[in-house]
């Protein structure tokens, strides 16, 4: 049997991240595609994971997450945003942010509902909506700075709208919402039975002195939102797969109904380790904006004379590369050329759209060692010099 006739996702293939990472391995290319660091975690975190296993924390953890970790999460939210969150009723530890997003969508969205999301949208969003029997309403962000078109959002709202799926800082657009955006969103859904799912895994990767605009800081939205975060991003440890969701007690109960049958719980020793790490280093995340901004600036400065345009990167650990000076639109083909001719794997943006526009942009991951970034930029600059600008 070549195909399964009753597939719930008949048009969904392997994610672009898996495809490009596999191709990078096959070709021995530098992988600036998938968003994970090529440097190690803090050795202390590794020591704490090993210690937790040796101490016997190797059986099921509590379904909602280890209380000591949930208490540290509440403390972190207080330090980050001045918020008071009840670790018992408002914090749920999840198998990464993706599971939190999936479980929240399954908990509150059903057949016939509509979910508004903003393209380019992260590729796990739409399948989660469709698996709930609902429909995604995809509203493109406005390039080149990928701003929200709030008039289109207002026009898309109807009695079937159940959820707005928000993402800030935005992957893959590298944009960041403002407090004004949050106030506008609150105004758009005011008085309606509409919830918000806010993906904020890059909360600490914002640049140029900006503060992260979390929905938790907008009181109307906070009451109607699931807000999702990631220790994988905050601790440079994507393989640990530890995320968490913050919501009101009412919404948290609904989330946990799905979470308990989705994963039940996540790695017990890892939760102990992260709780202990946060106890030892409660503000370890404070240096992240400067750490990643230095990498962003390193890449932008090195590519300044390459001929590539560099759209603003206000958040996330990515940088977009506009190749319109070198080639007609076609980001998948250009990403393939960068991979095979320059030896650098990137991610095209068109897979993140329902209806891709003519795109001349690929995404680079800058969460890499400086030596990796320097070599990648050297290869990209050499590639640009070889192919020359279109019409030159």
Residue ranges of model-derived segments:
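Conserved PLP-anchoring active-site segment centered on the Schiff-base-forming lysine
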Residues: 107-129
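Conserved glycine-rich beta-strand-loop-beta hairpin in the small C-terminal domain of fold type I
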Residues: 275, 290-300, 310-323
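N-terminal small-domain helix-loop-helix segment of the aminotransferase-like
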Residues: 2-96, 103, 278-280, 386-392
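PLP-dependent enzyme catalytic core of the Aspartate aminotransferase-like
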Residues: 337-346, 352-392
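Active-site PLP attachment segment
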Residues: 217-254, 266, 360
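Active-site phosphate-binding strand-loop segment of PLP-dependent enzymes
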Residues: 137, 141-210
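A short helix-loop-beta submotif of the ANL/AMP-binding
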Residues: 131-137
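Structural signature of PLP-dependent enzymes
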Residues: 57, 255-259, 278-301, 328-330
């Amino acid at each position: 049997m070549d195909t399964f006739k009753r597939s719930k996702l008949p048009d969904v293939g392997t994610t672009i991240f898996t495809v490009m990472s596999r191709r990078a391995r096959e070709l021995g290319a530098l992988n600036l595609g998938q968003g994970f660091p090529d440097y190690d975690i803090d050795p202390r975190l590794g020591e704490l994971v090993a210690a937790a296993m040796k101490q016997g924390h190797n059986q099921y953890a509590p379904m909602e997450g280890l209380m000591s970790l949930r208490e540290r999460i509440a403390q972190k939210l207080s330090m980050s945003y001045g918020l008071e969150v009840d670790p018992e009723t408002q914090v749920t530890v999840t198998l990464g942010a993706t599971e939190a997003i999936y479980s929240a969508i399954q908990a509150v969205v059903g057949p016939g509902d509509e979910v508004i999301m903003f393209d380019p949208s992260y590729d796990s969003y739409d399948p989660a909506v469709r698996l709930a029997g609902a429909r995604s309403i995809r509203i493109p962000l406005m390039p080149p700075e990928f701003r929200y078109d709030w008039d289109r959002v207002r026009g898309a709202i109807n009695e079937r709208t159940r959820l707005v799926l928000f993402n800030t800082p935005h992957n893959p657009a590298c944009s960041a919402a403002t407090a004004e955006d949050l106030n506008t969103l609150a105004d758009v859904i005011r008085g309606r039975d509409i919830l918000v799912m806010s993906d904020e895994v890059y909360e600490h990767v914002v640049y140029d002195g900006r503060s992260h605009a979390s929905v938790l800081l907008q009181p109307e939205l906070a009451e109607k939102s699931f807000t999702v975060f990631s220790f994988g991003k905050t601790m440079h440890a994507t393989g640990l797969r530890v995320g968490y969701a913050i919501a009101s007690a009412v919404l948290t109960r609904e989330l946990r109904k799905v979470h308990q049958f989705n994963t039940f719980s996540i790695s017990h020793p890892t939760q102990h380790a992260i709780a202990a790490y946060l106890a030892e280093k409660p503000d370890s995340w404070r240096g992240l904006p400067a750490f990643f901004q230095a990498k962003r600036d390193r890449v932008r400065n090195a590519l300044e004379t390459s001929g590539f345009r560099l759209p603003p990167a206000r958040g996330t650990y990515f940088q977009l590369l506009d190749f319109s000076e070198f080639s007609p639109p076609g980001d998948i083909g250009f990403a393939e050329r960068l991979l095979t001719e320059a030896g650098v794997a990137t991610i095209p943006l068109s897979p993140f759209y329902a209806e891709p526009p003519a795109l001349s942009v690929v995404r680079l991951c800058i969460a890499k060692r400086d030596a990796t970034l320097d070599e990648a930029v050297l290869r990209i600059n050499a590639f640009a010099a070889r192919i020359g600008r279109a019409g030159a």
